């Protein structure tokens, strides 16, 4: 049975970038990776209500730069930048020997961000809202924002059923095999009284076409 590859991982180096932008030798690689994981988990937990879509980490010598993509930048920045300073102080406990820089990037259309959509559906499931209603409402809002297509899947003991199953809804087109297609992917888990329910969201935002270089006139080139 064929399994779906992660849409972001498939397109890295083609139309997508790495979420971790650094290089380390064999000796330091594992430590850096563990640090990255701790930083991501902490920032995600700290800014749970701020709608954090993704966190990019850049490293250079003794410096770490975090690019935090969020739908509500004001909730992270705080009054007069107090939130940023408090976050830096907390992160210093994880990486005490490094200088931390934080850059906040606003997610303009939260309704079209796959990760935020998945987390929104998961939150509704935890509030005992019907999974079908949650998925359909999220899809409708996403399509109104001007995207080309969206697909959502919920897996687990849906509606408290004895046997776990998966249900999907989609609208528009989702060309998962087309490498130039800009596919955004998000995953979240809902902790319900019946157990965990996994939520996956695929969003198709259109094709990313390579920039064509202007062809020089042959006669001008000869001259």
From Swiss-Prot:
Query: What InterPro entries is this protein classified in?
Result: KH_dom, KH_dom-like_a/b, KH_dom_type_2, KH_sf_prok-type, Ribosomal_S3_C_sf, Ribosomal_uS3_bac-typ, Ribosomal_uS3_C, Ribosomal_uS3_CS
Is RNA-binding there in the keyword field?
A: yes
MF terms (GO), sorted A to Z: mRNA binding; rRNA binding; structural constituent of ribosome
**What are the record's GO terms for cellular component?**
cytosolic small ribosomal subunit
Q: Which Gene3D superfamilies match?
A: 3.30.300.20, Ribosomal protein S3, C-terminal domain
**Family annotation (Pfam families):** KH_2, Ribosomal_S3_C
Q: Which domain of life is it from?
A: Bacteria
* Residue stretches spanning the membrane: none
Please give a single GO biological process term from the UniProt record.
translation
Q: Which UniProt keywords apply?
A: Ribonucleoprotein, Ribosomal protein, RNA-binding, rRNA-binding
Q: Where is the KH type-2 domain?
A: 39-108
Q: What is the role of this chain?
A: Binds the lower part of the 30S subunit head. Binds mRNA in the 70S ribosome, positioning it for translation.
- Annotated PANTHER family: 30S/40S RIBOSOMAL PROTEIN S3, SMALL RIBOSOMAL SUBUNIT PROTEIN US3C
Subunit-structure text: Part of the 30S ribosomal subunit. Forms a tight complex with proteins S10 and S14.
Indicate the family of this protein. Answer: Belongs to the universal ribosomal protein uS3 family.
Protein name, as recorded: Small ribosomal subunit protein uS3
Designated gene of the protein: rpsC
